[in-house]
UniProtKB/Swiss-Prot annotation:
A Pfam family the protein falls into: VPR
InterPro entries xref list: Lentiviral_Vpx_assoc_factor, RetroV_VpR/X
Assembly: Interacts with the P6 region of unprocessed GAG. Interacts with host VPRBP/DCAF1, leading to change substrate specificity of the CUL4A-DDB1 E3 ligase complex.
Coiled-coil ranges from the UniProt annotation: none
Phylogenetic lineage: Viruses, Riboviria, Pararnavirae, Artverviricota, Revtraviricetes
Broad class of the protein's primary localization: virion
Alphabetical GO biological process terms: symbiont-mediated suppression of host innate immune response; viral life cycle
Motif residue range(s): Nuclear localization signal: 65-72
UniProt keywords, alphabetically: Host nucleus, Host-virus interaction, Inhibition of host innate immune response by virus, Viral immunoevasion, Virion
Organism: Simian immunodeficiency virus (isolate F236/smH4) (SIV-sm)
One GO cellular component term noted in the UniProt record for this chain: host cell nucleus
Localization of this protein: Virion; Host nucleus
Role description: Plays a role in nuclear translocation of the viral pre-integration complex (PIC), thus is required for the virus to infect non-dividing cells. Targets specific host proteins for degradation by the 26S proteasome. Acts by associating with the cellular CUL4A-DDB1 E3 ligase complex through direct interaction with host VPRPB/DCAF-1. This change in the E3 ligase substrate specificity results in the degradation of host SAMHD1. In turn, SAMHD1 depletion allows viral replication in host myeloid cells by preventing SAMHD1-mediated hydrolysis of intracellular dNTPs necessary for reverse transcription.
Superkingdom per UniProt: Viruses
Protein name in the entry: Protein Vpx
Length: 112
């Protein structure tokens, strides 16, 4: 009787796949940030980035990749809701938001 379990295709070892996943995550975070500034206030993007690091990484002790993944999910959801409500941005950038005092938080990747 033959083994019914699926076999790993050649060239797809765990190490290669994991490395590609991290590259994909970093690249996707940068790309979504470049797109998000055309639809969301920069201040909002920066605050979500900062708060994601404070909560998921610092408070919960999660890895950098998990923190970036959670941030990515939040920004994707924000863009989805924005577009669902009827985006009329047409590529114009929004201002800083103007609703927070003090120095701005450090920018997320792709917006530095």
């Amino acid at each position: 009787m033959s083994d019914p379990r699926e076999r790993i295709p050649p060239g797809n070892s765990g190490e290669e796949t994991i490395g590609k996943a991290f590259e994909w995550l970093n690249r996707t975070v940068e790309e979504i940030n470049r797109a998000a500034v055309n639809h969301l206030p920069r201040e909002l993007i920066f605050q979500v980035w900062r708060r994601s690091w404070e909560y998921w990484h610092d408070e919960m002790g999660m890895s950098e990749s998990y923190t970036k993944y959670r941030y990515l999910c939040l920004i994707q959801k924000a863009l989805f809701v924005h577009c669902k409500k009827g985006c009329r941005c047409l590529g114009e950038e929004h201002g800083a938001g103007g609703w927070r005092t003090g120095p701005p938080p450090p920018p997320p990747p792709g917006l530095a």
